[in-house]
Design a protein with these regions (language model features):
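Short acidic/polar hinge/loop motifs at secondary-structure boundaries
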Residues: 2-22
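N-terminal periplasmic accessory domains that precede
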Residues: 4-6, 20, 32-53, 65
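Extracellular loop and loop/strand-boundary signature of outer-membrane beta-barrel proteins
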Residues: 52-54, 104, 108-113, 160-167, ...
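Transmembrane beta-strands of outer-membrane beta-barrel pores
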Residues: 55-61, 73, 84-88, 143-149, ...
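Transmembrane beta-barrel wall of Gram-negative outer-membrane proteins
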Residues: 61-88, 104-151, 172-177, 183
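Outer-membrane beta-barrel translocator domains and adjoining extracellular loop/strand segments
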Residues: 91-104, 150-158, 204-213, 217, ...
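Face-selective signature of the C-terminal outer-membrane beta-barrel domain
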Residues: 122-146, 168-315, 325, 357, ...
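Outer-membrane beta-barrel signature, preferentially recognizing the C-terminal barrel domain
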Residues: 229, 272, 276, 340-343, ...
Length: 448
């Protein structure tokens, strides 16, 4: 599921528990150089009708209201929930930029005031059907609606002094559908699961900028920026677990994830379109072997074939009104000239874990796994999200390659009746780092 569309609209009252896996095995996606957070939602465990309602209020007009209802019988478990959240976020900042050139040095001083007013609505409906005691079929639908208005005031105090005001509105919604099947074959040693997820998200942003400069009295300029984002994905997976005997168990499965991200961008009445497709086909296998009563090993590998394509187009009408003197237009036009970018690649992600039991309540674990950090939509979008401050333009690169990491970890855990202790140390080696590149000059058509 899309992280923003799902996580940002989850109310704490809908959460059953949160599981943290610091160094996951080959069964899990290798995305991200950290661990995995698995959010388990409430589905209801008591027979009959059950429900809860909760609310909260706080500073800066922060409020949220959450409700859950559930009906459970021998064959069915039906559940639903709704939540709303609103509030104000206020931030202030100060920046001092110093630019050092061969001929001279220059400084830029900025004072920023930002006020955000986010509002979110979430609805979740679903149910479980139990054909028999060994299997279940589940469906969940989640809807989220968010609206955020932002007012930003930027005062540049170094000469020439300027005051820039920006007003923006971010309106979006997402629809998430999830179907899953589970079969335990009448035993605790085998399990087959299959799932299909469809996620649709749309985001629409408008931004208006107003500037007053001391260069010309009462100069008031206006620049408008609009963009529409669509972020869709389809995910299908099958996983099978089998405990062959008391010492050996295996896991295997495959997963397909098809993602599509597109942006229609309107800057100064110049139209652009950015589209990014990423298709991932994965298969994995892993095994666990208890060599002795104290010592065991879990090892596996995950193979992924990835196909990515980034394309950036400009409207034919843009050529009628070229604006090569505008730095933002020049940045976008440079990226258009490099389109399209196709990058198919394959990779194997191994993992191995050694576990030693010091006692029945104390264990030591050594682990290694390879990770990948694929570019996110903010890092691949060539369009600056804020266009009102040209002294600090931030835009992504649609032609980025992923970065890889080798992660090693050692953990100690002690679980006693009155005291639990968990400690660990990890080492991470990142290659082909994705990082923001800061520069104070730009080249366009051979000119700096």
């Amino acid at each position: 599921s899309n992280r923003r569309g799902v996580v940002n609209n989850i109310n704490v009252g809908m959460v059953e528990k949160v599981e943290v896996i610091t160094n996951p095995s080959a069964k899990y996606d290798p995305d991200g150089v950290g661990g995995i957070i698995n959010i388990v939602m409430k589905r209801g465990a008591l027979d009959g009708f059950n429900g809860t309602i909760s609310g909260m209020t706080g500073e800066y007009e922060n409020r949220n209201l959450n409700s859950n209802i559930n009906y459970r019988s021998e064959k069915w478990n039906l559940f639903g929930g709704a939540s709303t959240r609103s509030g104000n976020n206020i931030g202030k900042g100060y920046r001092n930029f110093t630019y050092q050139y061969a001929e001279r040095d220059s400084s830029l001083f900025q004072n920023t005031l930002r006020i955000k007013n986010p509002a979110n609505i979430g609805v979740r409906l679903g149910g479980d059907y139990y054909p028999n005691s060994n299997s279940s079929i589940s469906y969940t639908y989640a809807y989220g609606d968010h609206e955020e208005t932002t007012k930003e005031n930027l005062e540049i105090t170094s000469p020439p002094s300027r005051i820039i005001e920006s007003e923006s509105a971010d309106i979006g919604k997402h629809h998430d559908h999830s179907v899953s099947y589970e079969n335990k074959f009448g035993t605790t040693d085998r399990k087959l699961t299959a799932s299909l997820d469809l996620n649709l998200e749309e985001d629409e942003v408008t931004q208006s900028n107003f500037e007053n400069s001391s260069l010309i009295d009462d100069l008031n300029t206006n620049q408008d920026t609009d963009f529409n984002e669509k972020n869709n994905s389809i995910t299908f997976s099958i996983d099978y677990e089998d405990q062959i005997n008391e010492k050996i168990s295996v896991e295997t499965g495959f997963k397909t994830n098809l993602k599509s991200f597109s942006t229609d961008y309107n800057y100064l009445q110049q139209l652009y379109n950015n589209k990014y497709d990423e298709d991932i086909y994965a298969a994995y296998t892993s095994f666990t072997y208890d060599i002795t009563d104290r010592f065991g090993i879990k090892a596996g590998a995950r193979f992924e074939k990835v196909e990515t394509k980034a394309s950036l187009d400009s409207s034919p009408e843009n050529d009628l009104n070229p604006d090569s003197s505008n730095i933002i237009s020049a940045i976008i036009n440079n990226a258009v000239g490099e389109s399209p970018y196709i990058n198919p690649y394959s990779k194997v992600y191994p993992s191995v874990f050694l576990i030693y039991k010091l006692s029945s309540m104390q264990t030591i674990q050594l682990g290694y796994s390879k990770k990948v950090n694929r570019p996110g939509r903010r890092t691949i979008s060539p369009f600056p999200r804020n266009t009102f401050d040209i002294s600090r333009i931030r835009n992504g690169n649609p032609y980025l390659n992923p970065e890889y990491a080798d992660v090693a970890e050692m953990k100690f855990s002690s679980n006693a009746r009155k005291l639990n202790v968990n400690a660990g140390i990890s080492y991470k080696l990142v290659k082909d780092n994705i990082m923001w590149w800061d520069r104070d000059m730009f080249e366009y058509e051979g000119k700096v």
